[in-house]
């Protein structure tokens, strides 16, 4: 996937990206969970032309299917002002890929949800199947959830609709009742129990109860959050708190390689029968 553009439902993904307000920040969690559906930010980048330059490169990626390599070239004029090059080539490559994949995968997920959760569509395609990305170094829980089939309105999706963390390429496949029978099921599965673990950020002091298998701050449904934000257009844009900056990782962990995932084909309700002439 590193050399390929993420496959996106263009109209919905573009709308998702365009609907955000640019917000300067020092840390990723300055904006928390569903706040990312309203605020565009890049950790450590303050509001201004540099942030807008990164945003423009990402918007181009959503609009035209820019690959990661092309996105890197688009960011080259900004690298010195971003300050990433000072931390080494590995850090620069890691941050660039992280920004690219995090933003575009979230846009893809929100757009896919918009298609799949349409009231007319869920009448025909009521089941959703969790699909693992096929990463070479998978998270055990994500691999265990692969193939799990639940109704579209199961509460489990409130916290577990992917992506579920940094570098997560998992996705959701819509299924009709006929599709369900084709994979040997006569109904949806039972949702796994949600086990939570305590978490505390050592810098900000923020605490949370995080579902096992999900990274802190990722236990929300980006598609539903996007819908909620549109239903409340006057809700305030999240403002980053005055927290100290996070320490720069000395050896950022490599993201797992992700294969390109095809976008589910848009489901179109059949035309009603025409009366005889």
Language-model features, listed with the residues they occupy:
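Domain-core detector
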Residues: 1-165, 175-277
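Extended alpha-helical oligomerization segments
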Residues: 169-173
